[in-house]
């Protein structure tokens, strides 16, 4: 553990994720590009991309870990794929997201479901400083634009007094086991290789 603490987590993360690229363009680096991307996708996102719905058992597992009547901070809540079902068993939820378009969709869903225990905040996680006495923090695929990962994870740990869950979608091709059997190469996203190190060094 002592050796792990000496590792410069941010340096490794930034290298693996291309933050040191000479040409900095696209969603990762440009807020306006990112906002336009979500403005277009937001109305259809919940229907097309919903991990809570599509990954069997994930929602139940999170429910089991968080328990009933807890205060949840949802980092990168988006349109509420996880926020909405969690609100039905939580005391209250603070939903933080950088996209106004996605937060509008969240508001529509909350009204449709008759839920009043969710407050939405428009903010990047890096800039978020609002006081909130959370029991747990949930982050689902929401840290991909973070440059300083150590600071982002330490903030999550500070807010989640009882703990936190990070959900990350693995970048593997469909039927990847078949690729392995045939000794075919396929691309992996290196940030998932770094996640265990992040937990060890930051928490």
Residue ranges, per PLM feature:
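Conserved class I S-adenosyl-L-methionine
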Residues: 2-66, 69-78, 165-191
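Class I SAM-dependent methyltransferase SAM/SAH-binding core
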Residues: 79-126
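Short conserved loop adjoining the S-adenosyl-L-methionine
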Residues: 127-132
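A short SAM/SAH-binding and catalytic strip from SAM-dependent methyltransferases
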Residues: 136-148
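A short glycine-rich, Lys/Arg-flanked "PGG" loop and its adjoining helix->strand segment in the class I
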Residues: 150-164
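Short alpha-helix
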Residues: 192-203
């Amino acid at each position: 553990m002592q050796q792990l603490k000496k590792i410069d987590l941010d340096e490794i993360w930034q290298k693996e994720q291309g933050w040191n690229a000479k040409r900095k363009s696209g969603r990762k680096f440009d807020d306006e590009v990112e906002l336009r991307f979500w403005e277009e996708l937001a109305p259809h996102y919940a229907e097309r991309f919903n991990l809570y719905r599509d990954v069997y058992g994930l929602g139940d597992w999170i429910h089991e870990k968080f328990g009933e009547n807890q205060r949840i901070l949802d980092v990168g809540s988006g349109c509420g794929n996880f926020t909405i079902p969690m609100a039905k068993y939580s005391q209250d939820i603070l939903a933080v997201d950088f996209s106004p378009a996605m937060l509008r969709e969240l508001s529509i869903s909350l009204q449709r479901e008759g839920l009043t225990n969710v407050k939405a905040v428009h903010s990047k996680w890096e800039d978020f400083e609002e006081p909130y006495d959370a029991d747990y923090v949930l982050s689902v695929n929401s840290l991909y634009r973070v440059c300083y990962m150590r600071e982002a994870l330490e903030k999550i740990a500070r807010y989640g007094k009882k703990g936190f869950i990070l959900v990350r979608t693995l970048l593997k091709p469909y039927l990847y086991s078949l690729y392995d059997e045939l000794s075919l190469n396929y691309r992996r996203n290196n940030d998932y290789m770094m996640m265990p190190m992040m937990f060890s060094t930051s928490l």
